[in-house]
Curated annotation (Swiss-Prot):
BP-aspect Gene Ontology terms: translation
Subunit structure: Part of the 50S ribosomal subunit.
Superkingdom of origin organism: Bacteria
Keyword tRNA-binding: yes
Entry function: Binds 23S rRNA and is also seen to make contacts with the A and possibly P site tRNAs.
Name assigned to this protein: Large ribosomal subunit protein uL16
Entry's Gene Ontology cellular component terms: cytosolic large ribosomal subunit
Alphabetical list of InterPro entries matching this protein: Ribosomal_uL16, Ribosomal_uL16_bact-type, Ribosomal_uL16_CS, Ribosomal_uL16_dom, Ribosomal_uL16_sf
Gene designation: rplP
């Protein structure tokens, strides 16, 4: 599971997810990527589940880069507790993902294998995604899934 080693504050504000991603919008390390089309919180468990789905389909061939990290703690109050009495205890960790962010990258496998592996990974995530390819001149070409 992905989670930070240390944090300055145990509880943080929820924040707003306005606009599109400004950084991490192109395929940088691998040949193929999975790009988010919606804004959402993605938990460390969802990231790990998507990673396992990809690597199992690829039969541990190729290389996978996870380009999102769950830095943000989220809290939850216990069941059947009245409102008030402070903020709840930390429950888990989430990565804030905005539209346009490339979340996973793959290299070392054919396009058909990469497309299917990323499709399986996208089913584990709470956002709509699309398959993107790396362009030779540095950018990426977008292809809808």
């Amino acid at each position: 599971m992905l989670l930070p080693k240390r944090v300055k504050y145990r509880r943080v504000h929820r924040g707003k997810m306005r606009g599109n991603a400004k950084r991490g919008t192109t395929v940088h390390f691998g040949e193929f990527g999975l790009q988010a089309l919606e804004a959402s919180w993605i938990t460390n468990r969802q990231i790990e589940s998507a990673r396992i789905a990809m690597t199992r389909y690829m039969k541990r061939g190729g290389k996978v880069w996870i380009k999102i990290f769950p830095h943000k703690p989220y809290t939850k109050k216990p069941l059947e507790v009245r409102m008030g009495s402070g903020k709840g205890a930390p429950e888990g960790w989430v990565a804030v993902v905005k539209p346009g962010k490339v979340m996973f990258e793959i290299a070392g496998v054919s396009e058909e294998v990469a497309r299917e592996a990323l499709r399986l990974a996208s089913h584990k995530l709470p956002v709509k995604c699309k398959f993107v390819k790396r362009e030779e001149n540095g950018g990426d070409t977008n292809e809808s899934n």
